[in-house]
From Swiss-Prot:
Protein name in the entry: Urease subunit alpha
Assembly notes: Heterotrimer of UreA (gamma), UreB (beta) and UreC (alpha) subunits. Three heterotrimers associate to form the active enzyme.
GO cellular component, one term: cytoplasm
Top EC class for this record: hydrolase
UniProt PTM comment: Carboxylation allows a single lysine to coordinate two nickel ions.
Binding site for Ni(2+) 1: 136, 138, 219, 362
Gene behind this protein: ureC
EC number: 3.5.1.5
Record organism: Synechococcus sp. (strain CC9902)
Catalytic activity: urea + 2 H2O + H(+) = hydrogencarbonate + 2 NH4(+)
Annotated substrate binding sites: 221
Length: 569
């Protein structure tokens, strides 16, 4: 007969259920469970004396008849589409079901069959998110990949060839030779990868060559000359070959102003990097481009969020990254023109309004590759404290704000770069790139990272201990990151033209390669929970930013969550 237990006891046993609320780490963000797929009384849980045992919660069903490879039990899913409690079934490295796991012969409502061939991961009391996507990577050193993975990022898009001077400044992998070498290097790296070719050319031939060689996109960067002619040529090739174009515009306004760049774009889809401008772009008003319907605007994390240290650290970072000389007054003036407290403050608010849609790192080129998710939720916290609840949220929770911010580092970069059919959300059919977080460490330290259905990273104790938990406990790579397990668990994204040219075979690639698609039809309206189109203007004298006539300003944060409380530095 049924046995009633208290809500607290239930949460401690099976994790929170509908109506329960959770604080995200040490932030002011409160999450509330919207739905629970569990059938009360028929929950599954692994362990001695628990449910997933032969003839109880485990059926006799073999894998060949539909039992899943892995079940994540009682996880609290946080995604752009909802905050729900569910079991998640994985097969062949993909998500096959979100619902109720167990044995259909003994339990009600089973949609995920647990069999003798099923592994169990306990999701009770933990938050499950899609693996993060960082779409602004300078591939300066391979050690970035481990650092990103340790933060919950499982997909990295960008450009570079290592610590070359060009790569230190620009996210471009220029030319067929370098693209080929980077695609080969990707074979040993346990994340999904894609590389941008250099988009700075006024004629199409060299751009087409790079796309055919395997570039999944093209990057226009001012350090290579982002002129109206280059913008037009690059976008024309992108439209023809279905790849995304990313742009870092002309800070010095040498070849034109922001209005000239908008005119050169001609209404075509484009991903604007560090759209506020401290990372580069038309001074002082590149930020206004976020109001264009064809523009997919992103930030990089050096300015996320605006704090009392933001301005001070930027000048030195900028001088190093862009190969500037502090002894040359013009170089110093160039750097100083990009750093404006008014536009950085406005950037916080534009993110909170959903007018800026994506957050990425700018790894080792002013940004920190291991802090994308951390900085995203620090921004959300700061805005909750300074602006209060969003109109869409209730007095009980911050669900809409939390979903808006998780979308910035998951589904929206996936949509922008034509990879959303494989990654970016927890939905059936997608690659099982998943991150489990203890709520007290959400956004700062994942408990477990799953890549293509295999565990690639986890918090792990002393390997010589008698159990897995004795200290020192820290993140370490797991079996999924080694040997031939790596290739089938990871994707390399190429252009369709490169796939047609059989580039994977020509380069001897063993990883699964996928063509990006539908990059030219995506507009800002397609970006989840971040599609606002305010009319933005900047006062050229004071740099004050206005959206639909309203001044956007906020104070710098003095103290942040997800910081020194968690990091012994």
């Amino acid at each position: 007969m049924p046995y009633r237990i208290s809500r607290q006891a239930y949460a401690e046993t099976y994790g929170p259920t509908t109506g329960d609320r959770i604080r995200l780490a040490d932030t002011e963000l409160i999450l509330e469970v919207e739905k629970d797929y569990t059938v009360y009384g028929d929950e599954v849980k692994f362990g001695g004396g628990k449910v997933i045992r032969d003839g109880m919660g485990q059926a006799q069903t073999p894998r060949s008849e539909g039992a899943v490879d892995t079940v994540i039990t009682n996880a609290l899913i946080l995604d752009w589409w909802g905050i729900v409690k569910a079991d998640v079934g994985l097969r062949d490295g993909r998500i096959v079901a979100i619902g109720k796991a167990g044995n259909p012969d003994t339990q009600e409502g089973v949609t995920i069959v647990v069999g003798p061939g099923t592994e169990a991961i306990a999701g009770e009391g933990q938050i499950l998110t899609a693996g993060g996507i960082d779409s602004h990577i300078h591939f300066i050193c391979p050690q970035q990949i481990e650092t990103a993975l340790a933060s919950g990022v499982t997909t990295m898009l960008g450009g570079g060839t290592g610590p070359a001077t060009g790569t230190n400044a620009t996210t471009c992998t220029p030319g067929a030779f370098h693209i080929g070498r980077m695609l080969q290097a990707a074979e040993g790296l346990p994340v999904n990868l894609g590389f941008f070719g250099k988009g700075n050319a006024s004629t199409p031939e060299a751009l087409e060559e790079q796309v055919r060689a395997g570039a999944c996109g093209l990057k226009l960067h001012e350090d290579w000359g982002t002129t109206p002619a280059a913008i037009d040529a690059c976008l024309s090739v992108a439209d023809q070959m279905d790849v995304q174009v990313c742009i870092h515009t002309d800070t010095l306004n040498e070849a034109g102003f922001v209005e000239d760049t908008i005119a050169a774009i001609k209404g075509r889809t484009i991903h604007t990097f560090h759209t506020e401008g401290a990372g580069g772009g038309h001074a002082p008003d590149i930020i206004k481009i976020c109001g264009e319907a064809n523009v997919l605007p992103s930030s990089t994390n050096p300015t996320r969020p605006y704090t009392r240290n933001t301005l001070e650290e930027h000048l030195d970072m900028l001088m190093v990254c862009h190969h500037l000389d502090p002894k040359i007054p013009e170089d110093v003036a160039f750097a100083e023109s990009r750093i404006r407290r008014e536009t950085i403050a406005a950037e916080d608010i534009l993110h909170d309004l959903g007018a800026f849609s994506i957050i990425a790192s700018d790894s080792q080129a002013m940004g920190r590759v291991g802090e994308v998710i951390t900085r995203t939720f620090q921004t959300a916290h700061k805005m909750k404290v300074q602006r209060g609840a969003l109109p869409e949220d209730s007095s009980r929770n911050d669900n809409h704000r939390i979903k808006r911010y998780i979308a910035k580092v998951t589904i929206n970069p996936a949509l922008a770069h034509g990879i959303s059919r494989d990654v970016g959300s927890i939905e059936t059919g997608k690659l099982a790139d998943l991150v489990l977080w203890k709520p007290g460490f959400f956004g700062i330290r994942p408990e477990l990272v799953i890549k293509g259905g295999s565990i690639v990273w986890a918090q792990m104790g002393d390997a010589n201990a008698s159990i897995p938990t004795p200290g020192p406990v820290h993140g370490r790579p797991m079996f999924g990151a080694f040997g031939k397990a790596l290739a089938p668990s990871c994707l390399t994204f190429l252009s369709a033209a490169a796939m047609d040219a059989d580039i994977p075979k020509h380069l001897g690639l063993e990883r699964t390669c996928r063509a990006v698609s539908d990059t030219r039809s995506v507009g800002k309206s397609a970006l989840k929970l971040n599609s606002a189109l305010p009319n933005v203007s900047v006062d050229p004298q004071t740099y004050e930013v206005f959206a639909d006539g309203e001044l956007l300003t906020c104070e710098p944060a003095e103290v942040l969550p997800l910081a020194q409380r968690y990091l012994l530095l």
